[in-house]
Amino acid sequence: MTMTDPIADFLTRLRNANSAYHDEVTVPHSNIKANIAQILKNEGYIRDFRTEDARVGKSLIIQLKYGPSRERSIAGLRRVSKPGLRVYAKSINLPRVLGGLGVVIISTSSGLLTDRQAARQGVGGEVLAYVW
């Protein structure tokens, strides 16, 4: 069965593993998922990630991050632009999550960027997800 929205599946697996306090989660690999994982790592939402060859294709293994008393680093994840309803934002109208405390992941002509990086570069694009 083909997957309609692999990014939503990726975010759902992260959300579920985070809710269950798992230390790591395995998802099917794709370049866009690896780029999203890199943004989450740079922003401090996950500890690390790596790619492994599985029996069928590659897998992306993400190590989740928790505080000293097991409080979650990721409070929420939300898919914004979906296959049935694409959401775009211009560089002057980039959305903010929790007044700038969260991160907006945007697909631009310069690759995947956070809202702050896109504003600094003056580019807009497709709003993929909110993370807080």
Curated annotation (Swiss-Prot):
It holds the Pfam family Ribosomal_S8. One of its GO terms (cellular component) is ribonucleoprotein complex. GO terms for biological process: translation. Keywords: Ribonucleoprotein, Ribosomal protein, RNA-binding, rRNA-binding. InterPro entries: Ribosomal_uS8 (IPR000630), Ribosomal_uS8_CS (IPR047863), Ribosomal_uS8_sf (IPR035987). SUPFAM superfamilies: Ribosomal protein S8 (SSF56047). GO terms for molecular function: rRNA binding; structural constituent of ribosome. One of the primary rRNA binding proteins, it binds directly to 16S rRNA central domain where it helps coordinate assembly of the platform of the 30S subunit. Part of the 30S ribosomal subunit. Contacts proteins S5 and S12. Belongs to the universal ribosomal protein uS8 family. This is Small ribosomal subunit protein uS8. The keyword RNA-binding applies.
